[in-house]
Amino acid sequence: MQIIWLGHGSFRIEIGDQVLLIDPWLTGNPMLAEDQHAAATTGATHILITHGHFDHTADVVALSKSLEAPVVGIYDFMSYFEAKEGLSVVGFNMGGTVTLGDVAVSLVPALHSTSYGPDATAPLGREAGFIIKGERYTVYVSGDTGISAEMDWIGDYYKPDIGILSAGGHFTMDMKGAAYAAKRYFDFKTVIPCHYKTFDLLEQSATDLIDALPDVDVIEPQVMTPIRF
C-alpha cells in the first residue's frame, strides 16, 4: 500500500491493483502544480468523495469521464452524479460496505456540512468519512470533520491502523483537536494530517499533533511523495 498526498484533503491511495483518488482537487489547488496533475490521477480505478464542497469535487466529473472511473460515495450524491452527469457511480450509505476489487470501503459519519454546485443551495446526502481495508491495513479517512462522538464506535468497531485526519482548523479540527480525537477514540499506529497549509487561515505545521502523540508515527506528508506501508 502507498498513500500519496495531493495537497489539501486530496489523496491517491494505491492498494494492489486498485488506485483510489480521495476528494481529488486539481483546478485551483495551490498545493498541486499543473504539471503534476497527470501523475496524480493516471491509472485511478475509483474516485471516492466525502462531501460536496468545491475543494473536494471541482474535478470529479471531468476525472470520472476521462479516467472511466466510477465515483464512490453517499447514495443521494451518487444518484445525482448518475442522473445529471451520466457518471458511473457506486452509492451506499452510513455503515455500508462496498468491495472495490480486493479493497473494502465502508462509509462512516463525519461532522461538517455539505452542498454542491455553483448555487450550493441544498445538500446532497451528508458529509462522510471512509474506512478502507486492504493489504492487512485499515485506514480511516476522516473527511472534513470536527471532533465527533461517532468516532468512539468507529475506532472501536473498525480498529484502524492508519488515520488520515483533517487537522487545519477553521473548517475542521485543528492539530490539537485531531490529537485529542486520536488519543481518545483510536489506537493508530500512524497518523497523516491533511486539510492544512493550503490557505493562510489554516494551520501551517503539524508540530502540535506530533508533540501530543509521542507514541504514534505522525507523518507530515509532502505533496506527490509516496508514504509506503
Swiss-Prot record:
Keywords noted in UniProt: Hydrolase
InterPro entries: Metallo-B-lactamas, RibonucZ/Hydroxyglut_hydro, UPF0173, UPF0173_UPF0282_UlaG_hydrolase
Keyword tRNA processing carried by entry: no
Superkingdom of the organism of origin: Bacteria
Entry keyword annotation includes Hydrolase: yes
One Pfam family recorded for the sequence: Lactamase_B_2
Entry's Gene Ontology molecular function annotations: hydrolase activity
PANTHER family: UPF0173 METAL-DEPENDENT HYDROLASE MJ1163, UPF0173 METAL-DEPENDENT HYDROLASE MJ1163-RELATED
Protein family membership: Belongs to the UPF0173 family.
Protein name as annotated: UPF0173 metal-dependent hydrolase RD1_1994
Organism: Roseobacter denitrificans (strain ATCC 33942 / OCh 114)
